From Swiss-Prot:
Subcellular locations according to the entry: Nucleus envelope; Presynapse; Cell projection, Axon; Perikaryon
Membrane-spanning segments: none
Cystine crosslinks: none
Keywords: Acetylation, Cell projection, Cytoplasmic vesicle, Nucleus, Synapse
GO annotations of cellular component type: axon; dendrite; nuclear envelope; perikaryon; RAVE complex; synaptic vesicle
Single GO BP term: neuromuscular process
Modification N-acetylalanine, positions: 2
Subunit structure of this chain's protein: Monomer.
Family assignment from sequence similarity: Belongs to the rogdi family.
Major localisation: nucleus
Protein name: Protein rogdi homolog
Pfam family, one: Rogdi_lz
Length: 287
């Protein structure tokens, strides 16, 4: 019995020494690694033109789709804003070609990119607040920090992977419709959003439902992408979507950012798992 107790005491001493090393050394090594990765992610969002404080450079992306040539165009992205847009739309009924560009005095902020960048900045702030001079005293303290960092990273990723669901009246009321010159015809709606690593442009063609229409009017709810036949009320008119054209372009640095988010979340989880291993040995007391 004495031998068993001595072995148990020796094991406990070894575990406690390993745990102290984990708290004092490995945790800070992981935090430093996370900082480096997230700073790289943050640089992808800022895309400075000259020096870290310079304005974001402009990048041109050609819109395309394997399913339609009704819409073609080029979008110019500058950081978290669309600074220019050049769109050609071929009307299905008469093949009339419409051409629209952004007004020179306008830019369209992409809130998804702005929000994702802010969440990354918040995660970096949380990590910096626990620099190498900070001494973690308990595993629970590390878990709390990792949970807070993971929350910010998950929110950042979700902003890019989960576009907002909008109703057609919300799209119609959006300022994006008034960004173009010449002004968009009243039977067109435009929406722009981020989906994963892609910048998507959707054009909705509308037609008015006649007051004596026999169609059962059912307003469509919110959606990322509405389908032909979706109905809504705007002003005194009832309208229906007749055609939907979606084109997109890949933004390489958004893909980089998503990879950085995934790697960072994995590092956080691995550190949490290591801390939790020790808690199983000392489940009867705080660790």
């Amino acid at each position: 019995m004495a031998t068993v107790m001595a072995a148990t005491a020796a094991e406990r001493a070894v575990l406690e020494e390993e745990f102290r090393w984990l708290l004092h050394d490995e945790v800070h090594a992981v935090l430093k690694q996370l900082q480096d990765i997230l700073k790289e992610a943050s640089l992808r969002f800022t895309l400075p033109g000259s020096g870290t404080e310079g304005p974001a450079k402009q990048e041109n992306f050609i819109l395309g789709s394997c399913g339609t040539d009704q819409v073609k165009g080029v979008l110019t992205l500058q950081g978290d804003a669309l600074s220019q847009a050049d769109v050609n739309l071929k009307m299905p009924r008469n093949n009339q070609l419409l051409h629209f560009t952004f007004r020179e005095d306008k830019q369209w902020k992409l809130q998804q990119i702005q929000d994702a960048r802010n969440h990354v900045s918040q995660a970096i702030y949380l990590l910096i607040s626990r620099d190498e001079s900070y001494q973690f005293k308990t595993g629970a303290e590390v878990l709390k920090l990792m949970d807070a960092v993971m929350l910010q990273l998950t929110r950042a990723r979700n902003r890019l992977t989960t576009p907002a669901t909008l109703t057609l009246p919300e799209i119609a009321a959006s300022g994006l419709t008034r960004m173009f010159a010449p002004a968009l015809p009243s039977d067109l709606l435009v929406n722009v959003y981020i989906n994963l690593n892609k910048l998507c442009l959707t054009v909705y063609q509308l037609h008015a439902l006649q007051p004596n229409s026999t169609k059962n009017f059912r307003p469509a709810g919110g959606a990322v992408l509405h389908s032909p036949g979706a109905m809504f009320e705007w002003g005194s008119q009832r309208l229906e979507v007749s055609h939907v054209h979606k084109v997109e372009c890949v933004i390489p640095w958004l893909n980089d950012a998503l990879v950085y988010f995934t790697v960072s979340l994995q590092l956080c989880q691995q550190l949490k798992d290591k801390i939790s291993v020790f808690s199983s040995y000392w489940s009867y007391r705080p660790f």
